[in-house]
Amino acid sequence: MPEYEKITFENGFRLLLSEDSRAKSCSMGVWVGSGSCYESDDTAGISHFIEHMVFKGSALYSSEDIASISDRMGGELNAYTDKECTCFYTRVLSADAPAAFELIADMVTSPRLDADDLELEKGVVCEEIAMYESNPADLCADLFYLVAFPEHKLGKNVLGTRDSVNSMTPDMLRKHMDRFYSPASTVACFCGKFERDKIISLCKRYFSSPANKSAIPALPKADFCPGVHIFDKKTEQNQIVIGFSAPSLGSDSRFACQLIASMLGGSASSRLFRRLREEQGLVYSVDACASSYLSAGVFAVSMGVSRESEKKAVLTASEVLREFPDTVTEEELDLARDHYLSGLIMSLESNSARAARYGTGELLLGGAISEKELEEKIRGVSIDEIRSLARSFSSLSDACICAVGRTAGAKFYNKVVSGKK
């Protein structure tokens, strides 16, 4: 039995319904194929800016209405923008689901985009940019993508720049929405308890307009660029990202990559955590993650470390990566599988997590992989696949290294990359 019902309108809009009669609430969201990967230099940050502006009022609701209605229903009406999509979501009691969705739908399809509101919001977004720039870990992550994908839009910052934000006009926002907020690149998802007929009727009211554009445009493959990039900044702790090219969202190898990330840095028993923190006390936090996008993928190790411990921490991390392909065991792989699948099963007890998985999967891949199929793919990853893929992460000469802070400097990192002691 499918995990959700899918209804596709003639114009390409997709509605996903996953009913749970035992629930007392409904989690819902609208996903749109608008993100920083679809922006030019002149429109950098426009997807995120639109996300802000829809909360400033719509055809039926003022900004005060939006806030008070959401508060009255007890839900958290929120949104986020990523590299490949924008999402508007909430969770409310089942009886309030139609009203909550009508609120989101009107915001998304009929935002006011008032010029005065836009000028005020420019200041808000510029403050948000300043906040992220003041956080070394966030700054390092953004800079990593910029230098790892310098010729591709995957490297663009979701927030944009102060110059691009300050140049935005209502007409620019409307043109972007006309292009990317088309029915064919929009997905709505409901998980929990709701009145099916009312939801379908509301979707027809708000999302049945003729499609004026095609679905999400295809992006070219993103070329990954290894190298060393040092950004000097006065910080109490240096931030390091060591990243490699990894499987994209359309590749089944991404499941092996997720398990490698778990074994190396995804838990308290992972190799990097044990070696750098528990055995040597070099870091408080070290992480390994696998991120897959439509045009590329990234496997990255990130850490925050003092300058005094930086060299030893980086050399130790390099050693762990180098040793891993030849020393990883079946026992470690079994542990990683169990850790991954246990987390998945527990997360899917949340209707909000299910809605996010279904909506994102439908928008980007044309369908979310089922829990059963995902378990089969995770269980099906062999030790040979792990070893083969891990070898592409074993040499820092293949890595893009981004370091922010009062770091050990380019000379040290270039020596590490070259393999010299």
What are these regions (language model features)?
Residues 20, 29-31, 214-271:
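His/Glu-based metal-binding/catalytic segments typifying zinc-dependent metallopeptidases
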Residues 5, 13, 24-28, 227, ...:
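A generic secondary-structure signal marking the coil-to-beta-strand transition
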Residues 48, 52, 152, 239:
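Histidine-centered active-site/metal-ligand motif
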Residues 28-34, 48, 104, 218, ...:
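A signal for specific C-terminal beta-sheet/loop modules enriched in small/flexible residues
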Residues 12, 19-70, 144, 252-264, ...:
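Active/ligand-binding-proximal structured segments within catalytic/core domains
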Residues 13, 195, 268-269:
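A generic "binding-loop/recognition-motif" signal
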Residues 3, 8, 19, 63-214, ...:
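Charge-rich, well-structured scaffold segments of protease-associated domains
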Residues 27-29, 87, 241, 300:
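Short hydrophobic beta-strand segments that form the core of ligand-binding sensory/regulatory domains
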